Each structure stands twice: as C-alpha cells, then as structure tokens.
C-alpha cells in the first residue's frame, strides 16, 4: 500500500468512525471461508457492516477522530475486524451466536455511545444491553401505566355513581 492509499484509507475510516456511535472490534482469524461468509451474511441481514482492517490504519483513524476511544486502540493486535451498527447489542448477539459453533470471533472491545468496553469477558453484558427502541418502549410503558390507572379509576368511579343515580 502506498502512502497515498494509506492516507485515503485512514480518511475513509475516520469518516466511518465519525458517523457511528456503535463500534465493535473483534478477532475473526481462524474462521474458514464458509464461516466467514456466513458471519458476513448474518451481519448484512442485521444491518451491521463488517470490515477487516489494518491495525495501524485504524489506530491512526481513531487518533484523527473527534471521539475519545480510550484504551480501545491498545486492543488492536493481531487480526482485526470492525462491526459498525445502529443497534447497541446487535454485533454482540451475532458474535455470541457464532460462538456456539466455534471459539471465534473473539471480542476485543466495543465503543458504544462514548462508553468503552474492553475484553471478551464483557460479551454477555453487551448482549443484554437494550436498544434505543427497547428503552423508549419501556419508558412509554412506564409513563402510560399510571395514566391508565387514573383513567380506569375515574371511569370506575363515574360508573358507580351513575348506577347509584338510577
């Protein structure tokens, strides 16, 4: 790769990093072609972009980015693949699903909404993260619950008064 190609690749990666709040870094080395293809297919179906990158280029892109990736660049050793997603737990679910059949991919770390998660031991925690839509749904449910009770009590009270008047 020439210097010009490297600078273009760093620029592209920097743009992608700026455009996402959810980034997973994993090691998919050792997966055969069929399994890698299945992983890519599963990512595509889930709306996740999977790319294999050079560590040095990714480190430079992280340094050039406005975001603080903390110690995440320190995890970039060996083969590295990055998952770009819109749902916080999407890549974790795919990684966990693939780990049922194989010991790979290994999670190196994740950057989720300015929070850094480092280590494969956090995979279960990341799987259990709620998506934005799930959190909004829970909040709406919590807000609606007291209002429904008040309305039900008022209707119940009105019905009981109506029966007495008759």
From Swiss-Prot:
Keywords, ordered alphabetically: Ribonucleoprotein, Ribosomal protein, RNA-binding, rRNA-binding
Keyword Ribonucleoprotein: yes
Superkingdom, taxonomy of origin: Bacteria
Coiled coil: none
GO terms classed as biological process: translation
InterPro entries per the UniProt record, alphabetical: Ribosomal_uL10, Ribosomal_uL10-like_sf, Ribosomal_uL10_bac, Ribosomal_uL10_bac_type
Molecular-function GO terms, alphabetical: large ribosomal subunit rRNA binding
Record's GO cellular component terms: ribonucleoprotein complex; ribosome
HAMAP family reported for this sequence: Ribosomal_uL10
Cited function: Forms part of the ribosomal stalk, playing a central role in the interaction of the ribosome with GTP-bound translation factors.
Subunit structure: Part of the ribosomal stalk of the 50S ribosomal subunit. The N-terminus interacts with L11 and the large rRNA to form the base of the stalk. The C-terminus forms an elongated spine to which L12 dimers bind in a sequential fashion forming a multimeric L10(L12)X complex.
UniProt similarity note: Belongs to the universal ribosomal protein uL10 family.
Name of the molecule in the record: Large ribosomal subunit protein uL10
